[in-house]
Amino acid sequence: EYCWFIDPIDGTRSFVSGVPLWGTLIGLEYNTKPSFGVIDHPCLDERYIAIDGKAFLIKNGKSDILRTSNCQSLNEARLGFTSYDMFKTRNDQLIFDSIYDQVKITRSGGDCYFYSLLASGHMDIIIESSLQPYDIVAIIPLIEAAGGFISSWDGGSPNRGGSIVASASQDLHSQAIDILKNFK
């Protein structure tokens, strides 16, 4: 059974503020497994596509294969997140802070563009909370096809949203999951 997930404007605050990092997300699940994903950034003329286990960036009529970075450790990682206020509970804030305090560089306000940066090797880890399925189904195949890892904070399936961690490498992902699980 096929199911489409479409978010026409992921990053509504960016969109209404004129920040060009918003995007359109189109994801397809087959038998509840995300199998195809597109993140389109029309203001940047960038389209990130995952299909058949491959991830591509299409820009200016050219296609480039995507690959996550080789970052292996939190203390060398570039962390992205949309907004601190997405961590609704004090416990979620403490969990997020425990990773935030360990990374090399932090950036916020990137919406779905940070996932595009992760897939292309320019961001190493993304931690978010309060996501809906339409926020993440298109992103899952992109991160995985580019060589990254994505899960819920407890290491489970990210398909239904909630609290998500996406990482460039398995070692980095394992370090983050170990910290995130210790707070639960």
Where are these regions (language model features)?
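Short amphipathic beta-strand/extended segments with alternating polar/hydrophobic composition
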Residues: 40, 50-51, 62-72, 177
